[in-house]
Amino acid sequence: MILALALGGMLSAQAQHVQESNFCSPFDFPILLSANFGELRPNHFHNGLDIKTQGVTGKPIHCIADGHVSRVAVLHGGYGQVIYVTHPNGLTSVYGHVISFAKNIQACVRQYQYAHETFVCDLKFQPGQFPVKKGDIIALSGNEGASAGPHLHLELRRTETGEYIDPMPY
């Protein structure tokens, strides 16, 4: 009970900051969740929202705010394919389990994979390389990595510290 009250107080303070940031939805259909922020998992707390994608892969994912693609990774487990967008308000949004990235980003990933003869990669980008605007399609939803069904794993983090923030309040 005390832990719940303490977590509730922390999330409330964070919610006020997030509401000021003017984010949009990552999808153009009504949001239904399969998992919430802070849910207890076998060995950790869930650090984001799992958004259902109507039981299918390939749904366009919209960038929730202006910023730049700062990182993409392709992994066998975990997020599978993941894209990180750094925003000027000091937050980074993370989109996990995607099936593919926007064409310009996907081309960069493929070029790296072929040049280095590896599927797995973790690429970091400079602010001017891949700028994005709120609403731009940055990826397609998937079921990649450690995923039990099609969905988008969406996280918000403080860019400087990596601290997780509940995306729900926006």
What are these regions (language model features)?
Residues 152-161:
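A short hydrophobic beta-strand segment most commonly corresponding to one strand
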Residues 1-9:
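Bacterial N-terminal signal peptides
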Residues 96, 104-131:
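Aromatic/His-enriched, Gly/Pro-containing loop or helix-boundary segments
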Residues 13-82, 86-91, 101, 118-119, ...:
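Surface-exposed, glycine-biased beta-strand/turn segments
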